[in-house]
């Protein structure tokens, strides 16, 4: 069954444009299609997202998750953690792009955990796990190999920067926060902010805020 048969007229052209623009392999394109279908199906029983139109899912979920690759070389990462993964953004799209990089999806909502685990199984993703620990417990009780933490529409920055506390096993990792164009750091966050990068998604301007325990020289 084609995308048009599933989602209506013009969906095929839109989907092919997405595949071409992002340079997806046939396997990756199929995984994104499976993910799209599961997102729509599960949303009827689990509140995953308010964004359900195909163009908006592509722009504001898939591509918004994927644009970080223009600023981070994922091929060099030994481990990535998606904080407050929710319906899997940005973790699942990035895992599809980089199947060999280990990922942890951090999510406390049991229904969303079930969805994420089902997506991982259906898409055949490997070297990826879902953790239902809250953020503070994760920092206290785990010691995974993680180079990059990602937070998109989850916790506030003053909570996220707990990762840089002296007792944290992840204090030397990098953190990237999906921010609005007008977001400004508070006095707690400012010492850890090392870079801001702006980007466009759909008709919106947004930015990435990069944090580290060491300022660049």
Residue map of PLM features:
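S-adenosylmethionine
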Residues: 100, 104, 108-217
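Mobile beta-alpha loop/short-helix "lid" or hinge segments that flank ligand
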Residues: 36, 87-90, 133
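Conserved SAM-binding loop of SAM-dependent methyltransferases across substrates and taxa
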Residues: 87-100
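Class I SAM-dependent transferase core
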Residues: 2-77, 112, 118-128
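Conserved class I S-adenosyl-L-methionine
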Residues: 76-86
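Generic detector of well-ordered alpha-helical packing
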Residues: 65, 83, 108-109
